[in-house]
Amino acid sequence: MQVKTLLGATFLALSLASCSTVEKVVYRIDVPQGNYLEATTVAQVKEGMTAQQVQYLLGTPVLVDPYNSQTWYYVFLQQRAYETPVQHTFTVKFDQRGIVTETHLDKPLPQVSQQGENNTIIETGEKPKSSWWKFWK
Protein backbone atom coordinates (compact mmCIF):
# COMPACT_ATOMS: atom_id res chain seq x y z
CA MET A 1 0.00 0.00 0.00
CA GLN A 2 2.81 2.43 0.86
CA VAL A 3 4.58 1.66 -2.41
CA LYS A 4 1.46 2.54 -4.41
CA THR A 5 1.03 5.78 -2.48
CA LEU A 6 4.69 6.68 -2.94
CA LEU A 7 4.60 5.90 -6.67
CA GLY A 8 1.34 7.82 -7.08
CA ALA A 9 2.72 10.86 -5.26
CA THR A 10 5.94 10.73 -7.32
CA PHE A 11 4.00 10.46 -10.58
CA LEU A 12 1.72 13.34 -9.58
CA ALA A 13 4.66 15.54 -8.58
CA LEU A 14 6.54 14.87 -11.82
CA SER A 15 3.50 15.42 -14.01
CA LEU A 16 2.59 18.70 -12.31
CA ALA A 17 6.17 20.00 -12.51
CA SER A 18 5.73 20.68 -16.22
CA CYS A 19 2.64 22.85 -15.58
CA SER A 20 4.65 25.67 -14.04
CA THR A 21 4.31 29.31 -15.09
CA VAL A 22 7.37 30.37 -13.14
CA GLU A 23 9.27 31.07 -16.38
CA LYS A 24 7.43 34.35 -16.97
CA VAL A 25 8.14 35.57 -13.45
CA VAL A 26 11.85 35.90 -14.16
CA TYR A 27 12.76 39.21 -15.83
CA ARG A 28 14.34 38.98 -19.28
CA ILE A 29 15.93 41.94 -20.99
CA ASP A 30 15.47 42.85 -24.64
CA VAL A 31 18.50 41.65 -26.58
CA PRO A 32 19.38 43.44 -29.84
CA GLN A 33 22.18 41.76 -31.79
CA GLY A 34 24.07 42.66 -34.93
CA ASN A 35 23.70 46.07 -36.56
CA TYR A 36 20.99 48.11 -34.84
CA LEU A 37 18.85 49.18 -37.78
CA GLU A 38 16.30 51.98 -37.58
CA ALA A 39 13.75 52.71 -40.29
CA THR A 40 14.87 56.35 -40.53
CA THR A 41 18.54 55.54 -41.17
CA VAL A 42 17.77 52.70 -43.59
CA ALA A 43 15.51 55.06 -45.56
CA GLN A 44 18.45 57.48 -45.97
CA VAL A 45 20.47 54.93 -47.95
CA LYS A 46 19.85 55.73 -51.62
CA GLU A 47 21.25 54.60 -54.94
CA GLY A 48 24.27 56.66 -55.92
CA MET A 49 25.77 56.88 -52.42
CA THR A 50 29.36 55.77 -51.84
CA ALA A 51 30.40 52.87 -49.62
CA GLN A 52 31.89 55.34 -47.12
CA GLN A 53 28.58 57.18 -46.82
CA VAL A 54 26.69 53.93 -46.23
CA GLN A 55 29.22 52.86 -43.62
CA TYR A 56 28.91 56.25 -41.91
CA LEU A 57 25.12 55.86 -41.69
CA LEU A 58 24.82 52.18 -40.77
CA GLY A 59 28.23 51.21 -39.43
CA THR A 60 30.37 48.27 -40.45
CA PRO A 61 28.35 45.48 -42.08
CA VAL A 62 27.97 42.19 -40.25
CA LEU A 63 28.85 40.26 -43.39
CA VAL A 64 30.61 41.08 -46.64
CA ASP A 65 29.92 38.45 -49.27
CA PRO A 66 33.14 36.39 -49.57
CA TYR A 67 32.49 35.68 -53.26
CA ASN A 68 31.43 39.19 -54.18
CA SER A 69 32.89 41.93 -52.00
CA GLN A 70 30.49 44.41 -53.57
CA THR A 71 27.59 43.08 -51.46
CA TRP A 72 27.16 44.06 -47.81
CA TYR A 73 24.72 42.49 -45.36
CA TYR A 74 23.43 44.30 -42.29
CA VAL A 75 21.68 41.84 -39.98
CA PHE A 76 19.61 42.97 -37.00
CA LEU A 77 18.20 40.38 -34.60
CA GLN A 78 15.80 41.65 -31.95
CA GLN A 79 14.57 39.41 -29.15
CA ARG A 80 12.11 40.97 -26.76
CA ALA A 81 11.61 39.38 -23.36
CA TYR A 82 9.51 36.25 -24.04
CA GLU A 83 8.75 36.78 -27.71
CA THR A 84 10.32 34.90 -30.59
CA PRO A 85 13.34 36.66 -32.11
CA VAL A 86 12.77 38.77 -35.23
CA GLN A 87 15.56 39.09 -37.80
CA HIS A 88 15.84 41.93 -40.31
CA THR A 89 18.40 41.74 -43.12
CA PHE A 90 19.33 44.82 -45.13
CA THR A 91 21.39 44.11 -48.26
CA VAL A 92 23.39 46.80 -50.06
CA LYS A 93 24.97 46.12 -53.47
CA PHE A 94 27.68 48.28 -55.02
CA ASP A 95 29.16 48.57 -58.49
CA GLN A 96 32.90 48.35 -59.25
CA ARG A 97 33.42 52.00 -58.25
CA GLY A 98 31.81 51.52 -54.82
CA ILE A 99 28.54 53.27 -55.65
CA VAL A 100 25.23 51.85 -54.33
CA THR A 101 23.25 50.22 -57.13
CA GLU A 102 20.63 48.27 -55.18
CA THR A 103 19.24 47.98 -51.65
CA HIS A 104 16.88 45.38 -50.23
CA LEU A 105 15.21 45.08 -46.82
CA ASP A 106 13.58 41.70 -46.20
CA LYS A 107 11.00 42.89 -43.60
CA PRO A 108 9.85 46.39 -42.73
CA LEU A 109 11.45 47.80 -39.60
CA PRO A 110 9.24 49.18 -36.83
CA GLN A 111 9.00 52.96 -36.74
CA VAL A 112 10.64 54.66 -33.77
CA SER A 113 7.22 55.76 -32.46
CA GLN A 114 5.98 52.15 -32.65
CA GLN A 115 8.87 50.72 -30.67
CA GLY A 116 7.61 50.01 -27.19
CA GLU A 117 9.69 50.24 -24.09
CA ASN A 118 9.91 47.35 -21.74
CA ASN A 119 11.37 49.51 -18.97
CA THR A 120 8.71 51.39 -17.06
CA ILE A 121 9.53 53.39 -13.96
CA ILE A 122 6.96 52.94 -11.24
CA GLU A 123 6.46 55.96 -9.00
CA THR A 124 6.09 55.03 -5.34
CA GLY A 125 5.20 58.42 -3.98
CA GLU A 126 7.36 61.11 -2.49
CA LYS A 127 9.11 60.42 0.81
CA PRO A 128 9.35 63.28 3.27
CA LYS A 129 12.90 64.49 3.64
CA SER A 130 14.30 63.76 7.05
CA SER A 131 17.67 64.81 8.27
CA TRP A 132 20.03 62.50 10.06
CA TRP A 133 20.77 65.40 12.44
CA LYS A 134 17.55 64.74 14.34
CA PHE A 135 19.26 61.82 16.05
CA TRP A 136 21.90 64.12 17.55
CA LYS A 137 19.45 66.57 19.09
UniProtKB/Swiss-Prot annotation:
Its main location: membrane. PROSITE patterns: PROKAR_LIPOPROTEIN. Disulfide bonds: none annotated. A lipid is attached at C19 (S-diacylglycerol cysteine). GO terms for biological process: Gram-negative-bacterium-type cell outer membrane assembly; protein insertion into membrane. GO terms for molecular function: protein-macromolecule adaptor activity. A lipid is attached at C19 (N-palmitoyl cysteine). Residues 1-18 form the signal peptide. Pfam families: BamE. It is found in: Cell outer membrane. It is a lipid-anchor. One of its GO terms (cellular component) is Bam protein complex. The keyword Membrane applies. Keywords: Cell outer membrane, Lipoprotein, Membrane, Palmitate, Signal. It comes from the Bacteria. InterPro entries: BamE, BamE-like, BamE_dom. Belongs to the BamE family. Part of the Bam complex. Part of the outer membrane protein assembly complex, which is involved in assembly and insertion of beta-barrel proteins into the outer membrane. This is Outer membrane protein assembly factor BamE. It comes from Haemophilus influenzae (strain ATCC 51907 / DSM 11121 / KW20 / Rd). The lineage of its organism: Bacteria, Pseudomonadati, Pseudomonadota, Gammaproteobacteria, Pasteurellales.
